[in-house]
Structure formats: structure tokens, C-alpha cells
Curated annotation (Swiss-Prot):
Belongs to the aldolase class II family. AraD/FucA subfamily. Pathway: Carbohydrate degradation; L-arabinose degradation via L-ribulose; D-xylulose 5-phosphate from L-arabinose (bacterial route): step 3/3. One of its GO terms (molecular function) is L-ribulose-phosphate 4-epimerase activity. It comes from Bacillus subtilis (strain 168). Pfam families: Aldolase_II (PF00596). The keyword Transcription does not apply. Its cofactor is Zn(2+). Keywords: Arabinose catabolism, Carbohydrate metabolism, Isomerase, Metal-binding, Zinc. InterPro entries: Aldolase_class_II_sugar_metab, Aldolase_II/adducin_N, Aldolase_II/adducin_N_sf, AraD. Zn(2+) binds at D75, H94, H96, H168. One of its GO terms (cellular component) is cytosol. Binds 1 zinc ion per subunit. Induction: Transcription is repressed by glucose and by the binding of AraR to the operon promoter. L-arabinose acts as an inducer by inhibiting the binding of AraR to the DNA, thus allowing expression of the gene. This is L-ribulose-5-phosphate 4-epimerase.
Length: 229
């Protein structure tokens, strides 16, 4: 069942270590088959070096396990909520990558300071508000998804494929699991670039709007011309 999706999600999870986005087991990737209404996600606490396609857990859109003998990621309710809230995404990544998490712990958006950021995100990468005690105590992971969706009332999730959860870390998404990994790598890279830019020039300002839009829309949208497609 869902063998192709399992292979993709396995490959994406293994890329977390390849791209140095995780320490120990501090991250997870999922993918969704919209037609079959099934989600495939990493099991909780399993080392990446031990992970196989057979270890991955298959869920329905209520977050219930329909295949697999292991417990799904503890972040499963967040993934499930985001798949419902963002109907055009096909994969989700959560990590505690150091640079993006530093911004999340500071409670700050990552400002768009250059064209690397502009190539992938059409605005600042937002940081969510702090969660209320009641949201943390009851249904914490579900409420994490809700606070992300709340943040994207003011952003286009397809044009800003990532977010910083306040005091926690980044979530990224994409057209599929591997594309979500790509966006997570970019987010980590621009998080580091932004930090160093601010350290070098405390008065640095966001990229010129015209330049930002030029770089974003030459790669995205109906008139994109970057690449070979």
C-alpha cells in the first residue's frame, strides 16, 4: 500500500541528516496521497540510520493509524491539521535546525534581506505568536497546527512555504516530501544569512520590493522563466 509514497517519505527523512537539519531524532517528514486520503509519516523516536520504508506509519485524515506497527511521530496532529488547512501541499518537514530554531526562540520573523530569500519566499518568514497555557496543556500538537494556520491568515502558504513556531522551531512544506525538504534547507540557509547580515550591519534593511518581486516571480507563477521547464 502506498509503496511509492513510502519510498519518497523515507528518502526525504534520510535527507534530514544529509543536509544537517537534525540532531539525533529531532525531526520528521510526512507526505500525503490526496486521492487515497492517506498520510505517511516517520515513526516517533526511531534513528534515521535504522529507518526503513516498512517502519513508516500510514494514517487517515483523522490521524488514525491504518498501517504500521510503530507509533507515529509525536508531531502527527500538527501535520494532519496542516494538510487540512493547506490543501495544495503534498509534504511537510519539521526540524530543530539550529539557525531557524534560533530565530524561532527569539520570536522573530526572518526578514527578507537578499535575493536568496526572495527566490523562495515572497515575504518575511513569519514567526507565530506564543501559545497560550491552555493551548499547550491541552492538545498541544494540534494547537501548534492551529497557530500556524492562524499565522497564515496574513500570508500565502504557497508563496511562503515555511514558518517558525515561537519558542519551538521551523515547519516547512512543499508539493511533495522532497520539495518540502528543499524548502527546509533553503529556510535554514537564509536564517543563517540573515543572522550574519544583521551582525555585520545592525542597520540593514529589507531587500528592495521591486528586486524581491523580480526574483520571486522569475521562479514562480505563470510568467516564470528560471530553469529549463
Amino acid at each position: 500500500m502506498l509503496e511509492t509514497l513510502k519510498k519518497e517519505v523515507l528518502a526525504a527523512n534520510l535527507k534530514l541528516q544529509e543536509h544537517q537539519l537534525v540532531t539525533f531524532t529531532w525531526g520528521n517528514v510526512s507526505g500525503i496521497d490526496r486521492e487515497k486520503e492517506r498520510i505517511v509519516i516517520k515513526p516517533s523516536g526511531v534513528e534515521y540510520s535504522d529507518l526503513t520504508a516498512d517502519d513508516l506509519v500510514v494514517l487517515n485524515l483523522d490521524g488514525e493509524v491504518v498501517e504500521g506497527s510503530l507509533k507515529p511521530s509525536s508531531d502527527t496532529p500538527t501535520h494532519v491539521y496542516l494538510y487540512k488547512a493547506f490543501p495544495n501541499i503534498g509534504g511537510i518537514v519539521h526540524t530543530h535546525s539550529q539557525w531557524a530554531t534560533s530565530w524561532a526562540q527569539s520570536g522573530r520573523d526572518i526578514p527578507p534581506l537578499g535575493t536568496t530569500h526572495a527566490d523562495y519566499f515572497d515575504s518575511a518568514i513569519p514567526c507565530t505568536r506564543e501559545m497560550y497555557d491552555e493551548e499547550i496543556i491541552h492538545d498541544y500538537e494540534l494547537n501548534t497546527g492551529k497557530v500556524i494556520a492562524e499565522t497564515f491568515q496574513h500570508h500565502n502558504y504557497e508563496q511562503v512555504p515555511g514558518v517558525l513556531v515561537n519558542n519551538h522551531g521551523p515547519f516547512c512544506w512543499g508539493t511533495d516530501a522532497l520539495n518540502a525538504i528543499h524548502n527546509a534547507v533553503v529556510l535554514e540557509t537564509v536564517a543563517e544569512m540573515a543572522y550574519h547580515s544583521i551582525m555585520l550591519n545592525k542597520d540593514v534593511t529589507p531587500i528592495n520590493t521591486v528586486l524581491h518581486e523580480k526574483h520571486f516571480y522569475r521562479k514562480h507563477g505563470a510568467n516564470a522563466y528560471y530553469g529549463q521547464s
